[in-house]
Curated annotation (Swiss-Prot):
Pathway: Cofactor biosynthesis; (R)-pantothenate biosynthesis; (R)-pantothenate from (R)-pantoate and beta-alanine: step 1/1. This is Pantothenate synthetase. It comes from Mycolicibacterium paratuberculosis (strain ATCC BAA-968 / K-10). The reaction proceeds by a bi uni uni bi ping pong mechanism. GO terms for biological process: pantothenate biosynthetic process. InterPro entries: Pantoate_ligase (IPR003721), Pantoate_ligase_C (IPR042176), Rossmann-like_a/b/a_fold (IPR014729).
Length: 308
């Protein structure tokens, strides 16, 4: 029996086969399928992805909600990860999303972990340092979602910047026919990057959490003095908050290779407040220490640092 689909309403499916069939039928009618993969616990950052997907002419938006066990390592917060499915579906309904895909782990991995994606050397750096299996889990589930949904475009936030880079790498290396769209990080009024994990913070930790974005802003404003100056400025802000345990603060190029001497770069930070681990990053324009612009031209560092 064909799965039912009602246009203009939220249709929820748990079976991968049902989503594949509905997506195929919609594509045959000329609709353009957009995929927003999430692990639920939706917030305004996720909704920014949904809205970006909805802006595509002729689009039908599929939001997947799946807490992927493959990307959680030993001792990580899989069981504690917030699950708010009813609230999430209500949000999607209010945004005019037409398809929610909410599979179980058994539906996604019916044969266990028989075949997985090998993510390559970048998976051992930055986030992959303390979490060596994380990106194999991320890329495997995203690859599966792409095969199940067959979207024109897939949307990710820039907050998880390494994830975005690695998904682009997988799509290019495995010749997957999809456009990967990165959406700028959505922030609270004080600059904190929105994250499902922010709800773990107590009131004191929540006040201190803004240190990450403050450090990145300081780094961006110092970037006209060179990469080393940007790192020093950011580190000084982080060091002023002893409650913060910094896992890394690194400057890289846009593809997460070595930082350039000048031009576009990414400053990335990961830190813990209590048991909560927070990530953030910012794009910046590095200039030579002499203050002269490199061949990339204008002094863009003087603009708003949140042009990421």
């Amino acid at each position: 029996m064909k799965p039912a689909f009602t246009a203009g309403e939220l249709n929820t499916y748990t079976s991968p086969g049902d989503v594949t069939a509905v997506s195929r039928a919609l594509r045959h009618t000329g609709r353009r399928v957009m995929l927003v993969p999430t692990m639920g616990a939706l917030h305004d950052g996720h909704l920014a992805l949904v809205r970006a997907a909805k802006r595509v002419p002729g689009s039908v938006v599929v939001v997947s909600i799946f807490v992927n066990p493959l990307q959680f390592g030993a001792g990580e917060d899989l069981d504690a990860y917030p699950r708010t499915l009813d609230d999430d579906l209500a949000l999607l309904r209010s945004e005019g999303v037409e398809i929610a895909f909410t599979p179980t782990a058994a539906a996604m991995y019916p044969n266990g972990l028989r075949t997985t994606v090998q993510p390559g050397p970048l998976a051992a750096e930055l986030e992959g340092g303390p979490r060596p299996t994380h990106f194999a889990g991320v890329l495997t589930v995203v690859c599966k979602l792409l095969q199940i949904v067959r979207p024109d475009r897939i949307f990710f936030g820039e907050k998880d910047y390494q994830q975005l880079v690695m998904i682009r790498q997988m799509v290019a290396d495995l010749n997957i026919d999809v456009q990967v769209v990165g959406v700028p990080t959505v922030r609270e009024a004080d600059g904190l990057a929105m994250s499902s994990r922010n709800r773990y913070l107590d009131a004191t930790q929540r006040e201190l959490a803004v240190t990450l974005s403050a450090a990145l802003t300081a780094g961006a404003h110092a970037a006209h003095l060179g990469g080393a100056a940007a790192l020093r400025a950011a580190r000084a802000v982080l060091d002023a908050v002893p409650e913060l345990t910094v896992d890394y603060l690194e400057l890289r190029d846009a593809g997460l290779g070595p930082a350039p001497a000048h031009g576009s770069a990414r400053l990335l930070v990961a830190a813990r407040l209590g048991n909560t681990r927070l990530l953030d990053n910012i794009e910046m324009q590095i200039e030579t220490p002499a203050g002269t612009a490199g061949p990339d031209g204008d002094r863009q560092y003087a603009q708003s640092p949140w042009r990421n």
